[in-house]
Amino acid sequence: MFSRVMFCTFLILPLLAAATAIPRTDTPSCSTGSLQCCSSVQKASDPLVGIIVALLGIVLGPLDLNVGLTCSPITVIGVGGTSCTQQTVCCTGNNFDGLIVAGCSPINIGL
């Protein structure tokens, strides 16, 4: 009886190990936009964003859109001491001189 259990275990264990192998990637996923370092990310419906947008005469899209405030581009990761101490985001929308960048999604990377 014990030998059957061990035999089945030795047959099934490699199958389970092979089934759970998932390739791991540590690189950020921002293939359709640009990496930005922003002081904060807010909804377009936020009152502060509304004031800034009104003063600059910018028309944003939907109110559930995320926008980055005071952003600077991150061009090359890990070269030249590039670091972001605020929020690293991937932005796919318009960039208004870095003051407001539309369509930003926060991503977690260690820069």
Curated annotation (Swiss-Prot):
Subcellular location: Secreted; Secreted, Cell wall
The keyword tRNA processing is annotated on this UniProt entry: no
Disulfide partners: C30-C90, C37-C84, C38-C71, C91-C104
Short name of any one Pfam family annotated for the protein: Hydrophobin
Parts of the chain that traverse the membrane: none
GO molecular function terms attached to this record: structural constituent of cell wall
Signal peptide extent: 1-21
Classification via SMART domains: HYDRO
Any one annotated GO CC term: fungal-type cell wall
Positions in coiled-coil regions: none
Technological use: Acts as a good biosurfactant, stabilizing emulsions in several conditions (concentration, pH, and salinity) and decreasing surface tension to a comparable value to that of some synthetic surfactants. Hybrid protein-metal nanoparticles can be synthesized via a simple one step method using vmh2 and gold. Vmh2 strongly binds to Au core whereas surfactants act as outer shells. Even if engaged within the hybrid complex, vmh2 can interact with a model protein, BSA, more than a standard organic-metal nanoparticles can do.
Observed phenotype of the null mutant: Alters the cell surface structure and mycelial hydrophobicity. Does not affect aerial mycelia formation on a liquid medium, nor the stress response to H(2)O(2) or SDS.
InterPro entries: Hydrophobin
Keyword terms, alphabetized: Cell wall, Disulfide bond, Secreted, Signal
Induction context: Expression is not affected by carbon source limitation.
Subunit structure: Self-assembles to form functional amyloid fibrils called rodlets. Self-assembly into fibrillar rodlets occurs spontaneously at hydrophobic:hydrophilic interfaces and the rodlets further associate laterally to form amphipathic monolayers.
Family stated for the protein in its record: Belongs to the fungal hydrophobin family.
Function field: Aerial growth, conidiation, and dispersal of filamentous fungi in the environment rely upon a capability of their secreting small amphipathic proteins called hydrophobins (HPBs) with low sequence identity. Class I can self-assemble into an outermost layer of rodlet bundles on aerial cell surfaces, conferring cellular hydrophobicity that supports fungal growth, development and dispersal; whereas Class II form highly ordered films at water-air interfaces through intermolecular interactions but contribute nothing to the rodlet structure.
Name the record gives this protein: Class I hydrophobin 2
Organism: Pleurotus ostreatus (strain PC15)
Lineage, uppermost ranks: Eukaryota, Fungi, Dikarya, Basidiomycota, Agaricomycotina
